[in-house]
């Protein structure tokens, strides 16, 4: 399940067939919520590397059909910076995916500035996706209807209010599920 929606089985062949049927030239692959950081920095670093290497192989096997956004290790900022460098320099990532909020902090929090600076130096594409909800969702209202929209919108607003967009103008941002 992804935010209350049953997800279909995925394979490269099925994805390419869907792209062809829909008239879509290529797709960008990434993983989203909950990401790879489940409480342990070292395990998150290991998981991010495994995920990114596997997705890079998919792209290598189908370079005209797939690109990828690298998975990082926030709230582990040092690990995220290291994995971003690895993903761009060795694996050929097209960008990174960041969760709008992690461990109670939203993008725009000064704690994430070192990562934003590193990504800004590369003029990186930063795809922002809703994070795990900080509190319970509204009963009878699926998370994807309102909560996800609010999560990415809050991240975008905090990034603007806290000067992230001014300090790091070369970040190429895309917000998923925002208003």
Residue ranges and their predicted role:
Residues 1-179:
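Helix-coil boundary/capping segments in enzymes
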């Amino acid at each position: 399940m992804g935010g209350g929606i049953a997800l279909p089985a995925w394979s490269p062949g099925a994805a390419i067939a869907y792209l062809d049927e829909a008239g879509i030239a290529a797709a960008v692959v990434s993983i989203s919520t909950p990401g790879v950081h489940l409480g342990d920095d070292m395990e998150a670093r290991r998981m991010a590397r495994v995920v990114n290497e596997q997705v890079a192989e998919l792209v290598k096997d189908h370079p005209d059909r797939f690109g990828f956004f690298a998975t990082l290790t926030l709230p582990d900022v040092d690990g995220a910076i290291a994995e971003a460098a690895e993903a761009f320099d060795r694996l050929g990532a097209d960008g990174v995916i960041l969760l709008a909020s992690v461990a109670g902090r939203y993008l725009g929090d000064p704690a994430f500035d070192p990562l934003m600076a590193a990504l800004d130096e590369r003029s990186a594409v930063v795809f922002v996706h809703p994070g795990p909800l900080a509190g319970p969702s509204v009963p009878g209202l699926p998370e994807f209807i309102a909560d996800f929209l609010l999560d990415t919108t809050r991240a975008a607003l905090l990034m603007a209010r806290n000067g992230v967009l001014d300090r790091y103008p070369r970040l190429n941002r895309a917000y998923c599920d925002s208003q």
